[in-house]
């Protein structure tokens, strides 16, 4: 069934796909409300995370994305706000055992995470081990029912058909979003990848663009081509760029 769905999606892509913006423009509030203000650096300190959370509150970002060890701290810093706490699982390689990813997700939610960004097993995807990839994602989704799960497909390592397969499997496995990149690979988000991913998953799933998004113009372009969320460590700079353009 999985292989059939992938082949069906590839055939549809070959016949009907057209690269064009999903919307004509995006304003500063569209960008602000899409940003997941991110610090996943291996040398991030508690003070860095406190600063990240303060900036997210002040700028009314959608959320913060932090390493698992800082979920509890971020939850405390954001108490009483609408800012979501997002963390990562199987990060950044995606090569952990499935049960490890599932337990990581459980512990993250117990610590206060609202959303989970898990890394797909890139090697198994490239080997066309569809069932493995499906079960890997499904196990995380099932382990934290009721929480949003995003699947990082690491587009920089995939060809077009592999990107399509990753999106199809993520959707079948019950994930809520597909995400372009970890930010630790050889490349980040592109409008072309974002558009393809949204075209494949449709309106039933979201797309998170992440990796290399540093300016207001970058963020607007990603949203215009289908991104629902923006993962970036440059959230403040991005919003300041929008304010300079539009005022306030």
Curated annotation (Swiss-Prot):
Its main location: cytoplasm. SUPFAM superfamilies: Aldolase. It catalyses: 2-deoxy-D-ribose 5-phosphate = D-glyceraldehyde 3-phosphate + acetaldehyde. One of its GO terms (biological process) is 2-deoxyribose 1-phosphate catabolic process. Gene3D superfamilies: Aldolase class I. It comes from the Bacteria. The keyword 4Fe-4S does not apply. PANTHER family: DEOXYRIBOSE-PHOSPHATE ALDOLASE (PTHR10889:SF1). This is Deoxyribose-phosphate aldolase. It comes from Thermotoga petrophila (strain ATCC BAA-488 / DSM 13995 / JCM 10881 / RKU-1).
